[in-house]
Amino acid sequence: MDSVSSSSFLSSTFSLHHSLLRRRSSSPTLLRINSAVVEERSPITNPSDNNDRRNKPKTLHNRTNHTLVSSPPKLRPEMTLATALFTTVEDVINTFIDPPSRPSVDPKHVLSDNFAPVLDELPPTDCEIIHGTLPLSLNGAYIRNGPNPQFLPRGPYHLFDGDGMLHAIKIHNGKATLCSRYVKTYKYNVEKQTGAPVMPNVFSGFNGVTASVARGALTAARVLTGQYNPVNGIGLANTSLAFFSNRLFALGESDLPYAVRLTESGDIETIGRYDFDGKLAMSMTAHPKTDPITGETFAFRYGPVPPFLTYFRFDSAGKKQRDVPIFSMTSPSFLHDFAITKRHAIFAEIQLGMRMNMLDLVLEGGSPVGTDNGKTPRLGVIPKYAGDESEMKWFEVPGFNIIHAINAWDEDDGNSVVLIAPNIMSIEHTLERMDLVHALVEKVKIDLVTGIVRRHPISARNLDFAVINPAFLGRCSRYVYAAIGDPMPKISGVVKLDVSKGDRDDCTVARRMYGSGCYGGEPFFVARDPGNPEAEEDDGYVVTYVHDEVTGESKFLVMDAKSPELEIVAAVRLPRRVPYGFHGLFVKESDLNKL
């Protein structure tokens, strides 16, 4: 193609795409994804934002010792020639080159029912109390994170690839307001300004040889032409939240944390990407652990190059301490969560790991995370305040594959550790067929002196997304509140387990099913009197979001954690649907006021 015809082609492409965009923005399109109907439209602007604020680096109030890696200045707000060309090329890949999508990355399958995204944000909106009353102990906010793609995917899409959206119900003196906002990540901002998806999807980007090569070339072209800069982060911040050192973070393990805050009205604001005064240069886990006694926070990161695991901590003031690289982990394991005790940190090296052979990944397709059936799972135990890995001990635990940890504690004067965690019995299905996953909660005791490992099942049910009273983190705890998979990732109820009943095969002591066609999310325990050291461990409430797929109505449920049926204390009708998501937490009102 000569220069004249090339110019004509690019000009025509730009005109066509610009016309399509104008038509799309002027007349929203109703799209049906299985049983869910969603409206395709441009994402709305946060009313609490304005252009001046978005274009200036944000700072934390009354704090000057830490660095916010803010989003860069606003990019070109209109469709450019290069953007139009790249978007057209991507449409060609999706339409003509991609092989038929596997169910795990087929948007029509992945985004069915209440997994379908809400395609606009919800400003603070009053909620209706339809049962009981909201206890004063719940003054504060329950916030849950989860994937919600800003744009409906045109090609392969995995559940883990969605942009992070926070759903916060703020409660004050028996009244509640709901707000749903995207975490304004660098990725979100770039794609919002472009008007289309730009950055590659990690879990669904490898889908056949030709398509994978084409997407790789397209990604390189976008970077080289300055459409986005991966140095600014490509994370989604869609996994969880953490509150420590008087800061609230939205987390995803592929990037730095994003600092967020709730306003007095209940609105959610993204402050910016946070690097802890330049000391956190890379990603960190979405499951940091804050010691309820010392106020310190412990975390790690993992990656595809040595050291495959790096352990670190933050002091009670939020100052990051030095890294402890763990070179005794000899292959890149998928390390999503870990546990701490009073004296130790515990890591799980499982049969799920990163696929390092890029040629095989391109040729075979599938997820960049795969199963190694020839590998024996191990648990690694390191002193909590270790300066290096010299005292790290590894223990083989055949068949023990955990994604999440529930709690852990020391026994026998620190010579043994106990770990409570859901063991995934079918680890090979974790990313491709979540409906076939069965997680069996186990109690594992490791004698650090003799190396003997003892295991005992706590429940035969399919349980995950389990929590405890946060005040007992790292200490001997009795009660666990776990979500019932029916099948995963749908959650049909919650059970309460008493792990002290170790002589029984099923330690279930309470259960609450949500009803036919109703599914919920991860439960969270909120203490009735968190400042009372004499309070019983289960004296509090279990809260979660629940959605009725028959009526299309979403609710916020408050359950009595001590009652044998987890009796519903209060139910709040939400002003609109809250999609299923991942992890959340409750932040009390006094802590919200510190943000």
UniProtKB/Swiss-Prot annotation:
Induction comment: Probably proteolytically degraded by PGM48 during leaves senescence. Not induced by drought stress.
Keyword Zinc applies: no
Region (Disordered): 41-74
Main enzyme class: oxidoreductase
Residues that span the membrane, as ranges: none
Expression across tissues: Mostly expressed in flowers (e.g. sepals and petals), siliques, seeds, leaves and cotyledons.
Record's keyword terms, sorted: Chloroplast, Dioxygenase, Iron, Metal-binding, Oxidoreductase, Plastid, Transit peptide
Feature: transit peptide: 1-34
Basic residues bias: start-end ranges: 55-64
One GO cellular component term noted in the UniProt record for this chain: chloroplast
One GO BP: beta-carotene catabolic process
Cofactor note as given: Binds 1 Fe(2+) ion per subunit.
Gene Ontology MF term list: metal ion binding; oxidoreductase activity, acting on single donors with incorporation of molecular oxygen, incorporation of two atoms of oxygen
InterPro entries with a match to the protein in the record: Carotenoid_Oase
Methyltransferase listed as a keyword: no
Superkingdom of source: Eukaryota
Subcellular location: Plastid, Chloroplast, Plastoglobule
Binding positions (Fe cation): 287, 336, 404, 583
Family as reported in the entry's similarity comment: Belongs to the carotenoid oxygenase family.
Function according to Swiss-Prot or TrEMBL: May be involved in carotenoid cleavage.
Quaternary state and interactors: Interacts with VAR3. Interacts with PGM48.
Official protein name in the record: Probable carotenoid cleavage dioxygenase 4, chloroplastic
